[in-house]
Curated annotation (Swiss-Prot):
A Pfam cross-reference name: BLTP3A_B
Keyword Coiled coil tagged: yes
Annotated region described as Disordered, given as residue ranges: 267-300, 882-904
The protein's name in its UniProt record: Bridge-like lipid transfer protein family member 3B
One GO BP: intermembrane lipid transfer
Polar residues composition bias: residue spans: 275-300
Keywords: Coiled coil, Cytoplasm, Endosome
Length: 1415
């Protein structure tokens, strides 16, 4: 009996072992136990059984002792146990892939029989190994793996031990069975060390990794008829890992991986070409004759339960998975290494990388038609990637159709060789799994296989990369450098922090047919990056050293660098709630308004080199390109200041080619540059031809760490959409040149045939574009350049105007930013810190590599149509009762309430009853002529007496009733908002009337929530343009403090001309939309305006501040609550200067160390808002407005042109410019109005705490007019108002030299390469001292001074005298000088008379308004 059993054992084990004899088997038949000693396993059989990759081969396997135990009576429920004591395996890597693996001996053991009892018993064997030692010898290193307590056993679908009958799920209808196995071990020890030889002496540290208990879960799906494995799923699960690597160990790992990369790549290609399609095709249901009927019959309910269970655990395709619950990786310097050839800037550094729930999935044989819903961890990210990939495949199918037709046209005389339709080959929405095999290929052969794809999916649930820590720093927990903010943003926990999918396409039988390009999808969610100087410098040196050692290793072992860096890959990167923090590196005395850093954030970001995503399509590039072309600044022919002749071409033709799809492979085929073929690389392109598009849905910048912000970020730049387009012209042209140099693709065709072929293709493409345009119904504003196609026919050459990288940055909407003095100082320090980091990085590159960094050339074009720059300045003095600016009120709500003892500041409170009464008074005027609604001129001034205030009230109001209302308001402690609306100086329109009638027409008082009142900003014939209506923001008031009725407060005081312009008072854009919809035709209050350029002399005007309250609109906020007390309000007050900037054109040229910034601003409109509550202003401004009122008109010439040169090339201007830069600025045709206090505050704003660096500069001002109003406090209230000053500057040149001195001249500097225009020959500084509100202004004289510029000085007269015509006339020099003086006097008198006429006109208009009110 024992002999028969030994023969059977030898029969089966001889397939796995070598030199096995009966004397090596000790068998106990009755106990079912046996032992084998000194077993030598068959290497090839073991390779086939383990299905090892072909780049790895087994040389020898030895086992000292094996024991087996067979439960004879329980074979159905209990497994056969096989125990091995010690297994030693020797392996080696193959430089060339070995032959593919054969069938597994487990399959052939039953003689290709059906899945029966014997197969179930063999498959249920459990294996345990005490110790396994695997030694691997590679080309450059030796490695060893030691595993202890390895166990392999069968489990149920819940991965638990149990009856063998429950470890498999069998589906007779499909003819398939699922089995589940688990492999675990106690410990694994991995060690790798470099091979030392006399030929290759390399300093390398051994790499060691020790892991704790881990396991592998395997699910197999077999066919019942032949036991072949149809699909399998393997999950490698690792528990917490802690790995400490020095830089030398990490370099060794990279070198070892590099040495294996070539062999692994060849093996992968071999595996793809030999992949069996039958293993991936769905198995048809087998007949009842193919499967043995089970011994016991089952009920339909049981069958349904089994089918459901099979579907739940079905393995639809082969996949491999790696799951690491937590990984802590520590990278540190190797302080004992002696191979360092450079001095480290940061020594003894260490960095910790912490990863949670890291998963890596690999699907080697995926069919696109099967979908991805069965993938592990399938979620929204995979859905997004699938929809994007479907669009890519749809475009590829279209190109295949056109390529098929091109091949047919290319070979019209050849026999009928049709090619398969793209829909048949790849499917309508992907790779079609039901390919019609009846379709012949290009050579009359049926397609052998369907295309497959291999996908890698990497997911990272959460991670933290900490800043570098050194031994000399204090002991504290390290701060994060890169982290995920899912918890703080309340994002779903199942959302991955990083999601990456990489997909390649191939034919399993290696068919030579076009395949789509690989695609890479990356999703980044809630990531936060913190710029740390020490970490950046340490990482820079660490990576440079790693790269340098890898290059030396490749050269030493003569490894081929066959990386596919030039191969095009379709890439898309999605970002959600990304944040980049730049902290201040220089610590200074911390002021409450001093930021600790700035944060750059975006709500959603999309970056792609494909045109299948929103805001990244060719039509978007076409629209942006057209916006840039609307400005001459971006033209390559624009060489005047601030641009120059050697500047880069910002609008490179590559962008235009790409917008019109003239840079594709199909376009080259249409042009006859490439012959049409149906091979694998027929539609492949180079990565050098990629055009990148990056779109930010919302992009904003905040200040971080401001103490006065109470832990909240403070807005720096409000959110706005932002688009960036990037191309690489030099790489593009080099790639195109290589394509053209490969030879004439049409050399086998005669010239006439080639011409006919290209002509046919072009006509077909034009017809297709024509009909697609007609169907689309869209006309492209940007016409195709006729030179685009012609330029492609010529060999491409690199021009001096071509940079390595061209960038177009386009801001679609209005931008608003605000900054105060301390934030400005912080930005200067931040700029110095970043500059220092860049310099250190550059020095480290030269130190490590031993050569200077490559000189990159970058061109950046930025287009911003409009922006508001708010300067938060020191508050204006409040003790001046006659100040032109309001002392307490502001265009934004100011909730400071004066006490009864302090009196009232000129505010009169009127409730709804008064509004209703007054409606009848002014209704007739409104019906008659809306423009005749004018106000009285009460000439109100600040007073502390309520009686005086009521005496100066308008005559149509009841003083007693108003006084009662005022006292009631003060008694309730109601806070009063003061929204100072700017009024026209020439036409004093009654704002109160418009507010009494307009709300009633819109039914504001009766119609519920969010109906804030809108005021039409009144127009005047004396203002330069008609400005759009704006609404008054009443947010920020605590709701519980809002009165239910509508309150209107009046405040009249003297205003400067700068306040006469119509300001854009901001509110929520939603309220603006609602109010404009509800408007009932009150737009008639806007009238046409005349040019304001002639009004140089101010007149007294009274303005009204109207506050509209709606209880349902009032919102409680911490800022309003904090401003309840007057003391807090005074500390919170700041004066605000808003610079409305229109038409910002910027070009940046970077050439190595040199950088040139050219800026051109079309128009700047200052707007002085006066004292404003800072937090109230920040909360109530309108961040979403497009500010169309400031962008309707563009000047023909820019007001400000600026050029800043940085780098060694600036030395041509001055020696100091090479270090600190050189600034050139031209201000022309600038007209504005300023208060003297505002100018003083601006000086304090830009004043630095430390001694600033001297920057040489040249500034020229031409045809500028500045209106100055002195609003300084008066010593005595009876003193007359200060006299306004008008500065007219025709030509002024200011130069700052290296010693810091300023030189001021009246002549332009010819070194500025700009055509300075001069309208007159003299520069005049005119001072107007007349009082604008005087009734007898004709008798007043005006003081003026006149300065003569150098280019009209007397030394030029001899040149005129030398003229023969003047000599013939007998005119002497003295006569000319005398005539010149007379002309000067006449000119001065004329200007004086013109000014007096303007003032007389203003006086008459003012008196006319009084007459209307008295009537």
């Amino acid at each position: 009996m024992a002999g028969l059993i030994k023969k059977q054992i030898l029969k089966h084990l001889s397939r796995f072992t070598k030199n096995l004899s009966p004397d090596k088997i000790n068998l106990s038949t009755l106990k079912g136990e046996g032992q084998l000693t000194n077993l030598e396993l068959d290497e090839e059989v073991l390779q086939n059984m383990l299905d090892l990759p072909t780049w790895l081969a087994i040389n020898k396997v030895f086992c000292n002792k094996a024991a087996i135990r067979i439960p004879w009576t329980k074979l159905k429920t209990h497994p056969i146990s096989l125990s091995l004591d010690k297994v030693i395996m020797e392996m080696s890597t193959c430089e060339e892939p070995r032959s593919c693996n054969g069938p597994s001996p487990l399959v052939t053991a039953s003689g290709q029989s059906e899945y029966g009892f014997a197969e179930k018993v063999v498959e249920g064997i459990s294996l345990s190994v005490n110790s396994i030692i695997i030694r691997i010898r590679a080309k450059a290193f030796n490695a060893s793996f030691e595993l202890s307590q390895l166990r392999i056993y069968s489990v149920n679908p819940s991965w638990q031990h149990g009856d063998l009958r429950f470890t498999r799920i069998q589906d007779p209808q499909r003819g398939e069975v699922l089995t589940f196995k688990e492999i675990n071990w106690q410990m694994i020890r991995i060690e790798a060390d470099a091979i030392q030889s006399c030929d290759h002496e390399i300093m390398s540290a051994p790499v060691r990794l020790i892991t704790n208990q881990s396991k592998i879960r395997i699910t197999l799906k077999r066919r019942l008829k032949d036991c072949n494995v149809v699909a399998s799923k393997l999950i490698f699960m690792l528990d917490d890992l802690l790995w400490v690597l020095t830089d030398s160990q990490l370099k060794a790992m990279v070198q070892y991986a590099k040495s294996l990369s070539e062999a692994i790549e060849k093996s992968t290609e071999q595996r793809k070409s030999m992949a069996s399609e039958t293993t991936q095709s769905p198995t048809p249901p087998v007949s009842s004759q193919q499967v043995k009927n089970p011994q016991t019959s089952t009920t339909p309910e049981q069958n349904n339960a089994i089918l459901k269970l099979f579907r739940d655990f079905d393995v639809k395709e082969t996949s491999y998975h790696l799951v690491i619950s937590h990984l802590d990786l520590h990278i540190c310097d190797d302080i004992h290494s002696k191979e360092k050839a450079f001095v480290r800037r940061v020594t003894g550094g260490a960095m910790q990388l912490s990863f949670s729930q890291l998963t890596v999935d690999y699907y080697p044989y995926h069919r696109e038609g099967d979908g991805c819903s069965h993938w592990m961890h399938y979620g929204d990210a995979t859905k997004t990637r699938c929809s994007w990939a479907q669009e890519l495949l749809h475009e590829f199918n279209s190109n295949i159709e056109m390529l098929r037709q091109a091949v047919k046209d290319h070979n019209p005389s050849s026999p009928i060789r049709t090619v398969p339709n793209a829909s048949q080959q790849y499917g309508q929405t992907g790779f079609d799994q039901n390919v019609k095999r009846s379709s012949p290929t290009a050579f009359g052969e049926p397609p052998k296989s369907n295309p497959l794809s291999s996908s890698f999916v990497v997911r990272l649930a959460d991670f933290n990369i900490f800043q570098v820590s050194t031994a000399d720093q204090c002991r504290s927990s390290p701060k994060t450098m890169i982290s995920c903010n899912k918890k703080s943003l309340y994002l779903p926990q199942e959302m991955s922090a990083i999601h990456i999918e990489f997909t390649e396409y191939y034919f399993p039988d290696g068919k030579n047919f076009p395949i789509p390009s690989p695609n890479l999808y990356v999703q980044l969610n809630a990531l936060q990056f913190t710029l740390d100087e020490k970490s950046v410098l340490w990482l820079n040196q660490f990576v440079l050293d790693l790269r340098q050692s890898l290059d030396q290793f490749v050269a030493m072992y003569k490894l081929s660098d066959n990386s596919k860096s030039d191969e095009h890959v379709d890439i898309r990167v999605d970002g959600l709630m990304l944040k980049f923090i730049i902290p201040s590196q220089k610590k200074q005395d911390c002021h409450p308004d001093q930021p600790a850093g700035i944060s750059i954030q975006t709500s959603e970001m999309i970056g792609s080199n494909t045109r299948q995503t929103a805001n990244c399509r060719r039509s978007d590039l076409e629209a942006i390109f057209q916006d840039f072309k609307d400005y001459d600044f971006y033209s390559k022919n624009f060489t005047s200041f601030p641009r120059s002749h050697d500047h880069f071409d910002i609008l490179h033709p590559i962008f235009q080619r790409h917008a019109f799809e003239q840079d594709t492979k199909m376009h080259d085929i249409y042009k006859g540059l490439v012959a049409p073929t149906l091979d694998t690389n027929a539609l492949s392109t180079s990565a050098a031809r990629d055009i990148w598009a990056i779109h930010f849905t919302q992009f904003w910048v905040d200040y971080e760490g401001i103490k006065s912000g109470k832990g909240r970020p403070v807005v720096f730049i409000d959110s706005f959409p932002f688009s960036i387009w990037i191309c690489q012209p030099r790489r593009f042209l080099q790639s195109q040149k290589r394509t053209l140099c490969d030879g004439d693709p049409l050399q086998s065709i005669s010239k006439s045939e080639s011409t006919d072929f290209v002509g046919r293709l072009q006509r077909k493409k034009l017809l297709k574009q024509y009909y697609s345009t007609e169907l689309g119904g869209s006309n492209t504003p940007l016409q195709k350049s006729q030179s685009l196609d012609s330029s492609l026919a010529n060999p491409p050459t690199c021009k001096q105007t071509d940079a390595d990288i061209h960038v177009l940055a386009h801001v679609q909407k209005h931008v608003s930013l605000q900054i105060n003095h301390y934030q400005y100082i912080f930005l200067l320090l931040l700029q110095e810190s970043i500059k220092q980091i860049l310099e250190n990085v550059k020095k480290d590159v030269e130190e490590v590599t031993g050569k200077p960094d490559d000189e990159n050339k970058i061109s950046v074009g930025l287009l911003l149509k409009s922006a508001d720059v708010s300067l938060l300045l020191l508050p204006l003095p409040e003790d001046n009762s006659k100040s032109p600016l309001p002392c307490e009120g502001s265009p934004v709500t100011d909730h400071k309430l004066p006490s009864p003892s302090e009196g009232v500041t000129g505010d009169l409170i009127i409730n709804n009853n008064v509004d209703l009464i007054n409606k009848a008074i002014f209704e007739s005027d409104l019906k008659g002529d809306p423009q005749k609604i004018v106000a009285t001129d009460p000439l109100l001034s600040k007073s502390s007496s309520d009686t005086e205030l009521l005496k100066r009230s308008p005559p149509y109001l009841d003083s007693t009733a108003d006084k009662d209302l005022l006292e009631a308001e003060l008694a309730f402690g109601q806070q009063i908002d003061r929204n100072n609306l700017k009024e026209d100086p020439g036409a004093n329109i009654d704002i109160s009337s418009s507010f009494l009638i307009h709300p009633l027409n819109n039914h504001i008082n009766s119609n519920g929530p969010d109906h804030a009142l809108a005021e039409d900003q009144f127009a005047s014939p004396l203002l330069p343009e008609v400005e759009k209506k704006q609404l008054v923001d009443t947010s920020g008031i605590p709701k519980e403090r809002c009165l239910p009725n509508l309150s209107v407060s009046y405040k009249n005081m003297k205003r400067s001309p700068s306040q006469f312009s119509l300001d854009n008072i901001s509110i929520d854009s939603n309220l603006l939309d609602e109010q404009m919809i509800e408007s009932d035709g009150s737009d008639h209050l806007e009238v046409g305006m005349e040019d304001f350029s002639s009004l140089n002399y101010p007149c007294t005007a009274e303005t009204s501040s109207v506050e509209l309250r709606n209880e349902e609109y009032c919102v409680s906020s911490p800022d309003a609550i904090s401003a309840e007390t007057s003391q807090d309000s005074r500390q919170d007050l700041m004066s605000v200067l808003v610079l409305k900037v229109v038409g910002i054109n910027c070009g940046i040229d970077i050439k190595g160390e040199d950088a040139t910034i050219c800026l051109q601003i079309n128009r700047v409109v200052p707007n002085q808002l006066g004292n404003v509550s800072v937090w109230q202003y920040l909360n109530s401004r309108n961040t979403g407005s497009d500010q169309k009122s400031t962008t309707d008109e563009r000047k023909s010439s820019p007001e400000i042109s600026l050029r800043l040169e940085i780098g060694p090339s600036a030395r041509r201007h001055s020696p100091l410019a090479a270090e600190n830069g050189f600034l050139q600025c031209n201000v022309s045709n600038f007209s504005s109005e300023f208060l003297t206090s505002t100018l003083a505050n601006i000086h304090h704003f830009v004043e630095e705490d430390s001694v600033p660096e001297i920057m040489p500069m040249k500034i020229q001002v031409q045809n500028a007019r500045i209106h100055l109003q002195d609003d300084s406090p008066r010593n005595n209230n009876t003193d007359p108002d200060p006299e306004p000053v008008v500065l007219n500057i025709e030509n002024l040149f200011v130069e700052r030299r290296d010693d810091g001195s300023f030189w001021i001249r009246g002549s332009p500097d010819t070194s500025l390469n700009s055509p300075w225009n001069h309208k007159e020959t003299s520069s005049i500084l005119q001072l107007d001292c007349s009082k604008s509100h005087s009734t007898n202004s004709k008798s007043k004289t005006s003081k003026f001074t006149q300065t003569i510029s150098e280019h009209t000085s007397l030394p030029e007269i001899p040149d005129v005298i030398n003229n023969q015509a003047w000599k013939a006339a007998g005119i002497s020099k003295e006569q000319l000088v005398e005539e010149n003086e007379c002309l000067k006097q006449e000119l001065a008198k004329t200007k004086m008379a013109l000014a007096e006429s303007h003032m007389e006109r203003d006086r008459l208009l003012h008196q006319l308004k009084r007459v209307h009110i008295e009537k």
